């Protein structure tokens, strides 16, 4: 997601793995997150996170590219799995997960002028999300993650340039 040359980095890292060793990566598919019914606070957060990633040059759809990245790195095509945590009801741990994700991105949000700490109010964000989403009966699927894994074979990997 944050690498200019992900296949080259994967090739380099895979060289540290002994033959038969497992190579595993997980990446985001931002476009697959959604909520029903819509929750204004959640939609605002989603837009801020999206805009922050765009300003930073992150590839927010990198999960779809993992198969080709493994192959370009000289590895066998990986097995893959797609999953997403789902948030529903007042006891979901996802409210805190969402708030802490936003907290971790807040310095970048401010740096790029996407949102200010005063707008985000991260210290009570989890509680505000819980109240708003529970009142609306919102069910939210976080952006999906695609996991990819393969075993390194003796003959794997291209020579580094």
Identify the residue ranges that each predicted region occupies.
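A short glycine-rich, Lys/Arg-flanked "PGG" loop and its adjoining helix->strand segment in the class I
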Residues: 7-22
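Amphipathic alpha-helical interaction segments
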Residues: 65-68, 124, 145
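C-terminal helical/coil "lid" or tail adjacent to the Rossmann-like core of SAM-dependent
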Residues: 79-140
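Conserved catalytic/acceptor-binding region of the Class I
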Residues: 24-92, 110-111
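A short SAM/SAH-binding and catalytic strip from SAM-dependent methyltransferases
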Residues: 1-7
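Core SAM-dependent methyltransferase catalytic element
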Residues: 73-76, 143-161
């Amino acid at each position: 997601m944050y690498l200019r040359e992900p296949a080259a980095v994967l090739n380099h890292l895979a060289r540290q793995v002994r033959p038969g060793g497992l190579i595993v990566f997980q990446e985001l598919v931002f476009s697959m997150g959604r909520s029903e019914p819509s929750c204004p606070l959640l939609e605002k957060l989603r837009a801020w996170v999206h805009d922050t990633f765009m300003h930073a040059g992150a590839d927010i759809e990198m999960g779809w590219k993992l198969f080709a990245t493994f192959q370009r790195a000289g590895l066998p095509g990986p097995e893959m799995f797609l999953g997403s945590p789902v948030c529903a009801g007042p006891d979901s741990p996802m409210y805190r997960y969402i708030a802490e994700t936003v907290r971790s991105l807040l310095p970048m949000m401010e740096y790029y002028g996407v949102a200010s700490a005063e707008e985000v109010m991260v210290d009570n964000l989890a509680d505000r999300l819980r109240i708003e989403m529970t009142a609306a009966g919102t069910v939210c699927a976080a952006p999906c993650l695609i996991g990819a894994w393969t075993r390194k074979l003796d003959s794997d990997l291209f020579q580094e340039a």
